[in-house]
Amino acid sequence: MTREEILSHVDHTLLKPEATWPQIQVICDEAIANHTASVCINTCYVKQAVEYMAGRIPVCCVVGFPLGAMDTASKAFEAKTAIENGAAEVDMVINIGRLKNKEYDAVREDIRAVKQAVGDKILKVIIETCLLTEEEKEKMCDIVCEAGADYIK
């Protein structure tokens, strides 16, 4: 694979809590220059980034980040607002505690609700593999597919 082919699959990301708009502009410019798949940012900058990018590179954002330990309605609201502000893709973090408790229906519903909120836009599910057993990783692959998400990360 060439450098360009690899970069075309990369989400250029800045998710630090202290990220500023000038820093977001820098990664937007880098994403444009390098033809990345998207620029992935916190939801508070989605509207500005969409305007700044002017359709050149899709804007992606994260919901329930970084912990995933928030209620489903809040994640869905955050996702819906991001889409209304122009996000083309949403990455969500699962509720790892619910997975560890084997509350599979709750985890599935969490993903389903966010997918419903984003509609036909892309939903990627962050499962934090470093925190999961092999069995939990396998279970999450099934749950993510059943819930209708587009990607698992």
Regions found by a protein language model. Name each.
Residues 1-34, 38, 44-153:
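Alpha/beta enzyme core
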